[in-house]
């Protein structure tokens, strides 16, 4: 199969592929730049490299260049400590790291993109490629390609089953795992997203999530497969993002619930040109859903994982009207089921589809990961009679107290409705009698007593679900994509 970027350069060449508000690259520009850089990357003779990058056009060129050079990319979370980065890269035998940000890491060859000479210094906002390397460009037809054609520089085809990217799970409930994502995985995910969410060549997708995460990288894959425009943003600033939404004909945006909340606080009270607001990474509260729908915001709640190359469950605004607690229905190209449902229909969510990884690179032990072709997500879920899927908690987060199963999400939902509590999380606390009992961590600027909380929670929860321990904290630990890091609270 021809590389998707190569196809877009041939068929959709003059369409804007990527812009950061200052510079804009057409698909022709992007392909030419990536192919020329790929030729230089081949000189490093690496089949797998780490990428320590920001959300920038240069980073996107680097990603495509690696793929054109048949190099697997291992994405590095830039918020990790040096020790965490080292452990991750060593676990998958990475020796060289390309970066667009300053990085010092012992034991690796670090190569800054600024130190690699290629043509990408003088791309202008009008989409014309300057001749900075002495390469002559054939402009006799609508497709602008080097006379030293990319086909003579690189192989323009690839194998769908080759590894495209490697990402590490967020590690919110345990050790991080290295997830290999093939081009087939990414393609199946993009097709599923198109079917459940909807996008086309006229889409203008504002990408604010880090591209070292699957939620950010997936936008780039969808774009190059479909041929739409990505508006890349390096850092989230609610005021600036709102201005872009108002002024730049943004049709799609990917957010986590907290960033949507900030935008609504900033004044996102109407959709403007927005057709789809894709949400994921954390649970949506009923209050946020109600507020967003009152503003007629086109919110689509979703659920996905690094192992599934992003979303595979999507809830439309209509679904959220009917069932605010749902993450929707599966894409047509995946199959989901509940393993060993209890009397309430709750059990572990299993998924099978071409978007699902084949197995972890590290650790390699697959015990319990796959069963009869289905991947065990580790999430407790329910599928109702209409096909709506509800996600309750991670299996590892389930609190078992005296033989009773307690879902932290149920307690957290009630606690967040207490006046003055802005955030809350419930974890299992060791107990000599019951094995575990619930402990509630909460964020509040008010003075709230344990007795007040017990009285309130007792009105809404069964007695065994009411937390026995409470702790007020300034903040709760979240990852850069808004996922709660419960493992950092288990010590308490």
Curated annotation (Swiss-Prot):
CDD domains recorded: OSB_CoA_lg (cd05912)
UniProt organism field: Staphylococcus aureus (strain N315)
GO biological process: menaquinone biosynthetic process
A Pfam family per the record: AMP-binding_C
UniProt-listed Gene3D superfamilies: 3.30.300.30, N-terminal domain of ligase-like (3.40.50.12780)
Catalytic activity field: 2-succinylbenzoate + ATP + CoA = 2-succinylbenzoyl-CoA + AMP + diphosphate
A single GO molecular function term of this UniProt record: o-succinylbenzoate-CoA ligase activity
Gene: menE
Pathway given in the UniProt record: Quinol/quinone metabolism; 1,4-dihydroxy-2-naphthoate biosynthesis; 1,4-dihydroxy-2-naphthoate from chorismate: step 5/7; Quinol/quinone metabolism; menaquinone biosynthesis
NCBIfam families (alphabetical): menE
Family indicated by similarity: Belongs to the ATP-dependent AMP-binding enzyme family. MenE subfamily.
InterPro entries per record: AMP-bd_C, AMP-bd_C_sf, AMP-dep_synth/lig_dom, ANL_N_sf, ATP-dep_AMP-bd_enzyme, MenE
Protein name: 2-succinylbenzoate--CoA ligase
Function: Converts 2-succinylbenzoate (OSB) to 2-succinylbenzoyl-CoA (OSB-CoA).
Residue intervals passing through the bilayer: none
Domain of life: Bacteria
Keyword terms, alphabetized: ATP-binding, Ligase, Menaquinone biosynthesis, Nucleotide-binding
EC number per UniProt: 6.2.1.26
């Amino acid at each position: 199969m021809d590389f998707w970027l190569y196809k877009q350069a041939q068929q959709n060449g003059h369409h804007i592929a990527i812009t950061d508000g200052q510079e804009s690259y057409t698909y022709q520009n992007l392909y030419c730049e990536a192919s020329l850089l790929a030729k230089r990357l081949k000189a490093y003779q690496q089949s797998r490299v780490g990428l320590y990058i920001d959300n920038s056009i240069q980073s996107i060129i680097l990603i495509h260049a690696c793929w054109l050079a048949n190099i697997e990319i291992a994405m590095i979370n830039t918020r990790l400590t040096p020790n965490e980065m080292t452990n991750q890269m060593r676990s998958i035998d990475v020796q060289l790291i390309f970066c667009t940000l300053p990085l010092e890491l012992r034991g690796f060859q670090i190569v800054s993109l600024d130190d690699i000479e290629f043509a990408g210094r003088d791309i202008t906002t009008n989409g014309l490629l300057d001749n900075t390397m002495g390469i002559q460009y054939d402009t006799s037809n609508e497709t602008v390609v080097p006379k030293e054609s990319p086909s003579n520089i690189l192989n323009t085809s690839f194998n769908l089953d080759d590894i495209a990217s490697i990402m590490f799970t967020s590690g919110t409930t345990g050790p991080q795992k290295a997830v290999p994502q093939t081009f087939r995985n990414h393609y199946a995910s993009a097709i599923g997203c198109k079917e459940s969410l909807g996008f086309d060549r006229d889409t203008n997708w504002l990408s604010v999530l880090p591209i070292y995460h699957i939620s950010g990288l997936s936008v780039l894959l969808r774009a190059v497969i479909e041929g739409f425009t990505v508006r890349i943003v390096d850092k989230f600033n609610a005021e600036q993002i709102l201005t872009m939404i108002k002024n730049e004909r943004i049709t799609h945006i990917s957010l986590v619930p907290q960033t949507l909340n900030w935008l609504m606080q900033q004044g996102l009270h109407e959709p403007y040109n927005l057709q789809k607001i894709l949400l994921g990474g954390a649970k949506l509260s009923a209050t946020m859903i109600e507020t967003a729908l009152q503003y007629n915001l086109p919110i689509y709640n979703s659920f996905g994982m690094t192992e599934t190359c992003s979303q595979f469950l999507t809830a439309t605004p209509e679904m959220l009207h009917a069932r605010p607690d749902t993450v929707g229905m599966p894409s047509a190209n995946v199959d989901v089921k509940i393993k060993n449902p209890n009397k309430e229909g709750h059990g572990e969510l299993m998924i099978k589809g071409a978007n699902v990884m084949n197995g972890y690179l590290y650790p390699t032990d697959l015990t319990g990961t796959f069963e009869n072709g289905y991947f065990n997500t580790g999430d407790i879920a329910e599928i109702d009679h209409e096909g709506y899927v509800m996600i309750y908690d991670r299996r590892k987060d389930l609190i078992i107290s005296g033989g009773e199963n307690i879902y932290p999400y149920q307690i957290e939902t009630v606690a967040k409705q207490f006046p003055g509590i802005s955030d809350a999380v419930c974890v299992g606390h060791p107990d000599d009698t019951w094995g575990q009992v619930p402990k509630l961590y909460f964020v509040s600027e008010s003075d709230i007593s344990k007795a007040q909380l017990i009285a309130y929670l007792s009105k809404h929860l069964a007695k065994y679900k009411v937390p026995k321990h409470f702790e007020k904290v300034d903040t709760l630990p979240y990852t850069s994509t808004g996922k709660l890091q419960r493992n950092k609270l288990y010590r308490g």
